Amino acid sequence: MNKKITLNIQIASKKIIFLPKKCQYLIWIRSSLMHVYQSNIKVLIRIVEKSEIKSLNYKFRQKNKATNILSFSYINDKMIDKNYIGDLIICSEIVTEEAKKKNVTLESHWAHITIHGILHLLGYNHDNLNNRIKMEYLETKIMASLNYKNPYIY
């Protein structure tokens, strides 16, 4: 059965060099969900500048620095629509910088960051070695299924 994905995208950045099309996000999200039996999901992706993601990172994680992505999962929140799995906040500037540094395509790196974020929304984490190995394995498997290179070898 095809899962219905409701995706809302907010653009809150003027510093965008590359932005995936909505259909690309949907492919990446659908591929990330292949092991999940939830029929329908809702996700928000917000594209922001460094200042906003730095502020959010400090407010919610007490880290006073910008990051590539923040994930806010609502999957276990009984007060929110059961299909709404969460929000992904992505800093396009940092994703672009990282892609250049790693010498990978912008599309590939956006795919990886989106998949990484979706897995966080679904409860995967890299807070210890065992969890990191599981999460990186899944990310690599999903990326390969979409004909992208291993995101951890560059």
Swiss-Prot record:
Keywords attached to this entry: Cytoplasm, Endonuclease, Hydrolase, Metal-binding, Nuclease, Ribosome biogenesis, rRNA processing, Zinc
Q: What is its EC number?
A: 3.1.-.-
**Main localization of the protein?**
cytoplasm
Taxonomic superkingdom: Bacteria
Its subcellular locations are:
Cytoplasm
Q: By its UniProt entry, which PROSITE patterns does this protein fall under? A: UPF0054 (PS01306)
Cofactor(s) needed: Zn(2+)
- Sequence positions that bind Zn(2+): 116, 120, 126
What Pfam families does the annotation carry?
Answer: YbeY
Q: Name one GO molecular function term.
A: RNA endonuclease activity
Q: How is the cofactor bound?
A: Binds 1 zinc ion.
Q: Which GO terms describe its cellular component?
A: cytoplasm
- Could you tell me the Gene Ontology terms of the biological process aspect for this record? rRNA processing
NCBIfam families cross-referenced by the UniProt entry: rRNA maturation RNase YbeY
Q: What does this protein do?
A: Single strand-specific metallo-endoribonuclease involved in late-stage 70S ribosome quality control and in maturation of the 3' terminus of the 16S rRNA.
Q: Which family does it belong to?
A: Belongs to the endoribonuclease YbeY family.
Full protein name: Endoribonuclease YbeY
Question: From which organism does this entry originate?
Answer: Buchnera aphidicola subsp. Baizongia pistaciae (strain Bp)
